[in-house]
Curated annotation (Swiss-Prot):
EC id: 3.1.-.-
Keywords: Hydrolase
Protein role: May have metallophosphoesterase activity (in vitro).
Gene Ontology terms, MF aspect: hydrolase activity
Family per similarity comment: Belongs to the UPF0046 family.
Name the record gives this protein: Metallophosphoesterase domain-containing protein 1
Pfam families: Metallophos
Statement: the UniProt record of this protein carries the keyword Hydrolase: yes
Keyword hit for Hydrolase: yes
Gene name tied to this protein: Mpped1
Annotated disulfide bonds: none
Lineage: Eukaryota, Metazoa, Chordata, Craniata, Vertebrata
Length: 326
């Protein structure tokens, strides 16, 4: 159902697993040590030596391993919106970073909607209510949503620190009373909201997490390295679909203006070495919109808004075989 840019044929979802897998390539000793330790039979990911400099990490792993080059990694064209869904498949419609700009979006047919965060500008209750109304107008059987760094009110620790400040960093948010944001998640009545939690729909185990590397002091920001790794360690093995707000290193995380890779190294190692989901959906980096695959996981940056906050990127459609036990 996907047409890879290096192959004139049509590539179905299950065929991605037959591509040369990144796990089969040579890994440096430091990388292997970062993921080889076991505890009670579980593979333990450790902080990568290049954690604090993702651009350097990308360069190192590319030069020494070709880790982000064909045939280990391929760009993939998503399913056309008007393509018929194969029998026995579930159609996922993936969006992210809509930033309260949902009116122009043409939503395609599908079974499950995934929104990877930044559905508001600041997480104001009025914005959340408007987003929830939009969700209610959509016909999908399931709608699964996580927060992003713009959903400030969803990060309770962030809000507790914000209202203590003497200056108004986010004036419209910092003036909110606790009773107006402490249960802001409850405003999302038309979806399944995930925050370091999982749900099973149609037989797919789906896990969602809002955290990303520090980004100018917004919501759900954490320092690179151990702090983020502790969040990724919460992701259970056996997850079919992973939703995070930010990207892993090397996958749709390039920021041309800064000439930098900004993805999380620990998230990459967690995804490729331990969790190995079939689908990883994220956003955050508006410039990275698109689809890639590494032979095990399909990576989707579903950012609807461009870097100039224009909602012109269409939703990305992914078809996956429905588990037989669903």
């Amino acid at each position: 159902m996907w047409r890879p840019r290096w192959d004139p044929g049509i590539l179905k979802a299950e065929a991605l697993a037959l591509l040369p897998c990144g796990l089969g390539m040579a890994f440096s000793q430091s990388h292997v040590m970062a993921s080889r330790r076991h505890q009670h039979g579980r593979l333990i990911i450790e902080v990568d030596e290049y954690s604090s400099n993702p651009t350097q990490a990308f360069t190192f792993y590319n030069i020494n391993q070709g880790r982000f080059q064909p045939p280990h990694v391929q760009m993939v064209d998503p399913v056309p919106h008007d393509a018929p869904k194969p029998p026995g498949y579930t159609r996922f419609v993936c969006v992210s970073d809509t930033h309260s700009r949902t009116d122009p979006i043409q939503m395609p047919y599908g079974d499950v909607l995934i929104h990877a965060g930044d559905f508001t500008e600041l997480g104001l209750p009025s914005e959340v209510k408007k987003f929830n109304e939009w969700l209610g107008s959509l016909p999908y059987e399931y709608k699964i949503v996580i927060a992003g760094n713009h959903e400030l009110t969803f990060d309770q620790e962030f809000m507790a620190d914000l209202i203590k400040q003497d200056f108004y960093y986010f004036p419209s948010v910092s003036k909110l009373k606790p009773e107006n944001y402490e249960n802001v998640q409850s405003l999302l009545t038309n979806c399944i909201y995930l925050q370091d939690s999982e749900v099973t729909v149609r037989g797919f185990r789906i896990y969602g997490s809002p955290w990303q590397p520090w980004f100018y002091g917004w919501g759900f920001n954490l320092p690179r390295g151990q702090a983020l790794l502790e969040k990724w360690n919460l992701i259970p093995e056996g997850v079919d679909i992973l939703i995070t707000h930010g990207p892993p290193l090397g996958f749709l995380d390039w920021v041309p203006k800064k000439m930098q890779r900004v993805g999380c190294v620990e998230l990459l190692n967690t995804v490729q070495r331990r969790v190995q989901p079939r689908l990883h959906v994220f956003g955050h980096i508006h410039e990275g919109y698109g689809v890639m695959a590494d032979g095990t996981t399909t990576y989707v940056n579903a950012s609807v808004c461009t870097v100039n906050y224009q909602p012109v990127n269409p939703p990305i459609v992914i078809d996956l075989p429905t588990p037989r036990n669903s």
